[in-house]
Regions:
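A generic structural motif
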Residues: 42, 68-70, 100
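A short tyrosine-centered beta-strand micro-motif
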Residues: 51-55
Length: 137
């Protein structure tokens, strides 16, 4: 009987320790890349200033990426419409973002992590547009 109680207490302790230390099995945020964007742009109906940005994937956020302006200390969650397959995964590149330019406004369209295979489609714009790529050097 005492051995069953000891085994049960050991099992409960093994399950409880991660919660006591705040490690409930969730992974920490993953920084996917940094880019210096030289112009203001629109994302999720919000205008963002030019500056240095980092893109972070946080577990538990589902299909969202966090876009963080490192200078202004502001951030916004961006919905991922779909994943984009890399056409040449062997080619090395820095993190890059793609913008759709419509008239004089630029809209965030895609994000590609540094040296990773797949990208993220973040926005779709209708009508005539021009693509502009900003890549981390």
């Amino acid at each position: 009987m005492k051995s069953r109680i000891a085994i049960a207490l050991s099992f409960i302790t093994i399950l409880a320790v991660p919660f006591a230390y705040g490690q409930s099995g969730s992974a920490s945020p993953v920084m996917m890349g940094r880019v210096d964007i030289p112009f203001k742009f629109m994302v999720a109906k919000k205008e963002m200033p030019a500056g240095k940005y980092e893109v972070v994937r946080e577990e538990g956020q589902g299909s969202h990426l966090l876009l963080r302006n490192m200078q202004a200390n502001t951030s916004i969650y961006v919905s991922v419409i779909e994943r984009l397959a890399e056409t040449d995964p062997s080619q090395k590149h820095g993190a890059r973002v793609v913008f759709d330019t419509v008239g004089d406004q630029k809209f965030l369209s895609e994000f590609w992590p540094a040296d990773k295979g797949d990208g993220y489609l973040l926005g779709i714009n209708k009508g005539e547009q021009k693509h502009e790529v900003v890549e981390q050097k």
